[in-house]
């Protein structure tokens, strides 16, 4: 099986459509379908900050749950939106406010449909996907080789948030260790979460979050070809979001 793994979309539907078309997908059915049966995989954070988060929920639900034509691994923004939909007490900030505003603008019956679709998508998707006979792992913020196969709380924190130190940057965002430099596993780890200006290959890992929602690019990785394809963002460039990885 061949896959096209898509970086953090964050509600940037137009960029997603442009990227999938560039990757050879046909949208005539209203969904991206590849003529050679390639499958899409998502590294999570499909919502928040961008203009079309609910549209992305609809599309990913349709592809993953209804048609079973794609793979989705949740990100930290997905986890927070899931908790919001469950009625938990979450802070509506750091991007969630844009998704909530879209949601609250809907009539109540449409709110219920979106809520149920996202809850189903989240609950029926694994923390990470092990694909192609364990040769590639699709996850949100990465995974250490000794964590592969585990799904306990410690691993969940790592996969959703990265290798956080407990310290904070001046803007409140967490300081993260560069776990990819220490990775010695054989499987390719394809992930996102931390915006980089260009896809970042380190050992057998590749970060494909090229900051679409911050005015960078939306990137897909063609697997097993290991070729990256990007399209430019239509949003303003926010330089401080592309912090050097420590």
From Swiss-Prot:
GO molecular function annotations of the record: bis(5'-nucleosyl)-tetraphosphatase (asymmetrical) activity; nickel cation binding; phosphatase activity
Cofactor(s), by name: Ni(2+)
Database matches in Pfam families: Metallophos
Catalytic activity from the UniProt record: P(1),P(4)-bis(5'-guanosyl) tetraphosphate + H2O = GMP + GTP + 2 H(+)
InterPro entries from the UniProt entry: Ap4A_hydrolase, Bis(5'-nucleosyl)-tetraP_PrpE, Calcineurin-like_PHP_ApaH, Metallo-depent_PP-like, MPP_PrpE-like
GO cellular component: cytoplasm
Protein family per UniProt: Belongs to the PrpE family.
Stored HAMAP family: PrpE
Name under which the protein is recorded: Bis(5'-nucleosyl)-tetraphosphatase PrpE [asymmetrical]
Species name: Bacillus cereus (strain G9842)
Gene: prpE
């Amino acid at each position: 099986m061949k896959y096209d793994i898509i970086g953090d979309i964050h509600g940037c539907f137009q960029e997603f459509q442009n990227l999938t078309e560039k990757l050879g997908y046909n949208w005539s059915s209203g969904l991206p379908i590849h003529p050679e049966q390639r499958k899409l995989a998502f590294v999570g954070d499909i919502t928040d900050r961008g203009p079309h988060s609910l549209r992305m929920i609809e599309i990913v639900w349709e592809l993953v749950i209804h048609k079973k034509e794609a793979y989705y691994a949740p990100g930290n923004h997905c986890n927070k939106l899931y908790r919001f939909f469950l009625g938990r007490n979450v802070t509506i900030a750091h991007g969630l406010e844009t998704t909530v505003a879209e949601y609250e603008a809907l009539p109540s019956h449409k709110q219920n449909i979106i809520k149920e679709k996202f809850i189903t998508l989240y609950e029926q998707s694994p923390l990470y996907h092990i694909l192609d006979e364990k040769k590639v792992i699709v996850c949100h913020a990465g995974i250490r080789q000794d964590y592969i196969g585990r799904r306990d709380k410690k691993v969940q924190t790592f996969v959703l948030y990265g290798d956080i130190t407990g310290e904070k940057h001046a803007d409140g965002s967490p300081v993260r260790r560069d776990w990819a430099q220490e990775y010695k596993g054989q499987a390719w780890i394809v992930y996102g979460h931390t915006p980089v200006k260009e896809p970042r290959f380190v050992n057998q890992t590749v970060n494909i979050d090229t900051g679409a929602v911050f005015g960078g690019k939306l990137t897909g990785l063609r697997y097993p070809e290991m070729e990256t394809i990007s399209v430019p963002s239509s949003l303003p460039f926010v330089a401080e979001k592309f912090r050097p990885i420590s």
